[in-house]
Swiss-Prot record:
<keyword id="KW-0472">Membrane</keyword>
<comment type="function">
    <text>Does not seem to be a permease of pimelate. Its role in biotin synthesis is not clear.</text>
</comment>
<dbReference type="GO" id="GO:0005886">
    <property type="term" value="C:plasma membrane"/>
</dbReference>
<feature type="transmembrane region" description="Helical">
    <location>
        <begin position="55"/>
        <end position="75"/>
    </location>
</feature>
<feature type="transmembrane region" description="Helical">
    <location>
        <begin position="33"/>
        <end position="53"/>
    </location>
</feature>
<feature type="transmembrane region" description="Helical">
    <location>
        <begin position="12"/>
        <end position="32"/>
    </location>
</feature>
<dbReference type="GO" id="GO:0009102">
    <property type="term" value="P:biotin biosynthetic process"/>
</dbReference>
<keyword id="KW-0812">Transmembrane</keyword>
<keyword id="KW-1133">Transmembrane helix</keyword>
<keyword id="KW-0093">Biotin biosynthesis</keyword>
<feature type="transmembrane region" description="Helical">
    <location>
        <begin position="87"/>
        <end position="107"/>
    </location>
</feature>
<keyword id="KW-1003">Cell membrane</keyword>
<feature type="transmembrane region" description="Helical">
    <location>
        <begin position="117"/>
        <end position="137"/>
    </location>
</feature>
<protein>
    <recommendedName>
        <fullName>Protein BioX</fullName>
    </recommendedName>
</protein>
Amino acid sequence: MRKFSTYDLAQISLLACLIIVTGMFKIPTGIPGSEFQLSAPIAVAIAAVFGFKRYFLAGIIASLILFLLGIHSILNVEISIIFRLTVGLIIVLLGTSIPVLVVAGPIGTMVARLGLAFTLGTPFLPLFVLAIPGMVITAVSVYPITKMLYAINKKVAGDHHVRNVL
């Protein structure tokens, strides 16, 4: 296992900041109690472009910062970790093709809601139904965001870091 370079540390920190900032944008979906966080498709795109290790480390850092600042509760952290593990596992096992990216976010959201239902002891269906609009928006927006992040990463890092994401 290679050590992290200064470039890697800066990149992971910037990705954590991107997750934090986009997680604060909550877009109403028209259904009371349901909202969409822009960080979901960004997270899937980060996993696809930068690899699981950078994605997961950035996500852990983002969750830790938000928790320490009091912005997130332990339930928010639980949902985030379950989502990240699920999305990361799907992308590591199935690759970064468009169909995989489109379904990774909604599956991650569904599994995270299942974990939340288990933790709270509440029925899964109401939690899942409220998440459907956000899952649809995530599925639709993940491909353009992935293309954008890939283009930015290629211009900034060059081919060297693009090929060595894992």
